[in-house]
Amino acid sequence: MELYYFSTFAFLLFCFILAKTLKKSGQSNLKLPLGPPPIPILGNAHQLIGGHTHHILRDLAKKYGPLMHLKTGEVSTIVASSPEIAEEMFKTHDVLFADRPSNIVAFKILSYDYSDVVISPYGNYWRQLRKISMMELFSQRSVQSFRSIREEEVLNFIKSIGSREGTKINLSKEISLLIYGITTRAAFGEKNKNTEEFIRLLDQLTVAVAEPNIADMFPSINFLKLISRSKYKIEKIHKNFDAIVQTILNHHKDRLANHKSSSHEENGEQNKDLVDVLLNIQQRGDFDTPLGDRSVKAVIFNIFSAGTETSSTTVDWAMCEMIKNPTIMKKAQEEVRKVYNEEGNVNETKLHQLKYLKAVIKETLRLHPPVPLLLPRECREQCEIKGYTIPSKSRVIVNAWAIGRDPNYWIEPENFNPERFLESEVDFKGNSFEYLPFGGGRRICPGITFALANIELPLAQLLFHFDWKLASDETNIDKLDMTESRGVTVRREDDLCLIPFPYSASSLKGKY
């Protein structure tokens, strides 16, 4: 009897979804971009499984062109895979593509009902948060105010590695803990007992958000949201995350209310953490839309989910590529050691002199953008690109990974070659559409300066203080597995395990 009811329910649900899908087929009269033929109900969703989505979309683009149309369930999806198309979306029609989809389950949960700067809809509220991010949270002055935190945390990181010289260490894990530590102190003022749990929850969310959710394919069928396992999984993790952040928020509020933050009062702006900045803005109330606690927590989530993953993933990939390319490793080490040999240690004073290291970072971001498929956008109004119609409300995906490997713009695009950036004016500020590791247009990542500061110093220190060898079970660098993991951000699937050997001129040698 139970099987009968289940079968009947499944059949009725199938018919309902089919009817909804057919009802949405009114776009067939439009001149849509080319794409693979869809099948009933699923559309092209079945073609996006069994591999990394950014790889699959790149391969499909080779056949159907750099501007593609796909159907994922009832959702019309436009995929951009070339610099020319990206320029149309991020420059020519920037305003039309400045929105985010409002029908993705995970977005609603993680953004505290669209209260953050990353997911909130385009409009006055988003402009307000964008201004706060650019002018107060991630300005050059603000990022520089955290210099002592970065230098202290990285120095402790180097000492910890040095204490284990000649032994195998999991460098990927150590880098991740370092970046989280820096971000935690910048955001909250201190590390606390919940730091490890905080990291664990963010890692779980990164994986959970990347899992397919049928409710996202059929957003008009609200019933699917009620039975979505993915939704409840994300909600459960996020609830635990929220509890930690709320405790930290309450602590900051109590401290401000009781005037106990004497160090902040004595030293002015320089000692304020990011939560202090947000709470001060909240108290001033000088924005059109009040900044409530949900907005503050949503922005904190942005800082950790975007900032930490971008930096730690990039440092990890850079070390992987240099291990695989020892000539490049040697050049980078020689540069850092030449600049800092007299000091015996790296600080941020002379980082601007490390031209080759900056090229290594740029090349790493080209080959391994932390978010290979930029967060989806939504077309606000029907428009035309390259003679094709882009329907209103269609979901838009830009394949930054494919664009960074476009052979029409990059010589030997699959090779790791930092020299290509030494005399190049290509940058990641959104003006070079062949290079979009941080996105482009109005929605470009507001935390670029913060992320880069957390990449440059750790890399420079790792290169200065140590020579590196693969662990004994990974002696063949040509066979170093560069397979990517699955998730919104793309790390290396296997952690990088190396053996450090102290550099003779390091001022820390023998003092670990």
Curated annotation (Swiss-Prot):
The gene is CYP71D351. GO terms for cellular component: endoplasmic reticulum membrane. Gene3D superfamilies: Cytochrome P450. The keyword Zinc-finger does not apply. GO terms for molecular function: heme binding; iron ion binding; tabersonine 16-hydroxylase activity. InterPro entries: CYP450_71D (IPR052306), Cyt_P450 (IPR001128), Cyt_P450_CS (IPR017972), Cyt_P450_E_grp-I (IPR002401), Cyt_P450_sf (IPR036396). Residues 23-512 are cytoplasmic. Its cofactor is heme. The keyword Amino-acid biosynthesis does not apply. Heme binds at residue 445. It comes from Catharanthus roseus. GO terms for biological process: alkaloid metabolic process. It catalyses: (-)-tabersonine + reduced [NADPH--hemoprotein reductase] + O2 = 16-hydroxytabersonine + oxidized [NADPH--hemoprotein reductase] + H2O + H(+). This is Tabersonine 16-hydroxylase 2. The lineage of its organism: Eukaryota, Viridiplantae, Streptophyta, Embryophyta, Tracheophyta. Pfam families: p450 (PF00067). Expressed at low levels in roots, fruits, stems, flower buds and flowers, but highly expressed in young leaves. Detected in adaxial and abaxial epidermis cells.
